[in-house]
Amino acid sequence: MSVTVLSLQSHVVQGTVGNSIAVPVMRAMGVRAWGMPTALLSNHNGRSSVAGIPIDSEQIDAMVNALDSNGELKHVDAVLSGYLTPRTGPAVLRTVERCRALHPDTIWVCDPVMGDMTPDGELRAYVPDETVSLMTDAVQHADVVVPNLAELGILTGTEPRTLDDIVRAARSLTGPHLVIVTSMPYHCLLYTSPS
């Protein structure tokens, strides 16, 4: 039996982020991946020019309601969330709750898309403060959190530079069972449990 993942992320025309890359990769691995857009964008939000079509909570709720009416939502084993906006975040949180109510073992993997490191090594947020607040709350309810180094700093109010800083910051996140930090300047894979 195949694993089913509901992937709630942005879809971009140009680039390999969000559902534009996650869904094809998961499908190639034999996962039943369902891509639901949280934003339709021209490209990655960190670029100098971005255009898009807004998605709101009502549209996400309607798509989730249709999946539920068709008897499909109960098959979701995991929810993967990525780029969220204040308009879509509440619906994504409701979707996770609905999936867990139908299938209590549903895992939520949250990629708190909020920023990146600049070429000169500065941590930079490219989302509004409302989104930072939303993500800070969301990660407390997720099972797995997958921040990049900048996002880890944004979530923890730190500027992790050394491996010890990174481990300390990852362990300070409350809520998730597992924190996987990506895009570190070290040749290792770091994962940690907050406790």
Label every PLM stretch briefly.
Residues 2-110, 114-122:
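Conserved N-terminal subdomain of the carbohydrate kinase-like
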Residues 27, 139, 174:
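Anion (oxyanion) recognition and catalysis
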Residues 78-168, 180-189:
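Conserved beta-alpha-beta core of the PfkB/ribokinase-like small-molecule kinase fold
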Residues 176-178:
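Acyl-thioester C-C bond-transforming condensing/cleaving domain
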Residues 191-195:
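Conserved small/polar residues in nucleotide/adenosyl-binding loops
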